[in-house]
């Protein structure tokens, strides 16, 4: 599975980048906790490389983690480890690329890559079904990021 979804946020790039690179802020806008029913907690300070969001089911069993792996002014990268089809380990990659559209507008691209850990044939079917849901959640993530950042007070005023 591989795709890119994009949105324009009516805020300067540093504000948008901060909302993505700070895992505490990310949890305020992410669509995933509600969609999965998992409890999410930040492990580490939430801003340093290696910090992670840990996803636990209702029994408290870890189902996955999203680790902050790179932060630049125009890019934030997360690497995930989670249970995929049949409980097999998946290692998706989510990169956020940012580009200024104007001084107060930022285009955000969410790049997603993952391979279901299944044999060919079965993998294609699983990725088709799983991919639809995951992609819809990525679109919702971007919409929620936009709402979160645009509702925040403008810095410096």
Where are these regions (language model features)?
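Short, intrinsically disordered, mixed-charge
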Residues: 18-32, 73, 127, 131, ...
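Hydrophobic ligand-binding cavity/cleft-lining segments
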Residues: 1-45
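Beta-strand/loop substructures that line and gate deep hydrophobic ligand-binding cavities in soluble
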Residues: 80-140, 145-147, 156-157
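Glycine-rich portal/gate segments that line the openings of hydrophobic small-molecule binding cavities
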Residues: 27-28, 38-87, 107, 140-157
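Hydrophobic/aromatic beta-strand elements that line small-molecule binding cavities or substrate pockets
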Residues: 5-7, 64-70, 92-100
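Broad hydrophobic/π-residue packing in well-ordered secondary structure
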Residues: 17-30, 65-66, 80, 96-98, ...
């Amino acid at each position: 599975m591989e795709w890119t979804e994009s949105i324009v946020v009516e805020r300067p790039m540093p504000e948008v980048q901060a909302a993505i690179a700070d895992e505490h802020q990310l949890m305020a806008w992410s669509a995933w906790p509600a969609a999965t029913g998992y409890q999410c907690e930040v492990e580490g300070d939430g801003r340093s490389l290696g910090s992670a969001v840990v996803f636990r089911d209702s029994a408290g069993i870890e189902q996955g983690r999203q680790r902050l792996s790179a932060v630049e002014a125009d890019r934030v990268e997360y690497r995930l480890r989670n249970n995929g089809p049949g409980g097999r380990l998946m290692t998706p990659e989510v990169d956020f690329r940012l580009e200024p559209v104007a001084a107060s507008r930022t285009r955000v691209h969410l790049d997603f890559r993952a391979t279901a850990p299944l044999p060919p044939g079965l993998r294609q079917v699983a990725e088709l079904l799983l991919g639809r849901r995951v992609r819809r959640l990525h679109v919702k993530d971007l919409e929620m990021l936009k709402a979160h950042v645009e509702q925040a007070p403008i810095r410096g005023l």
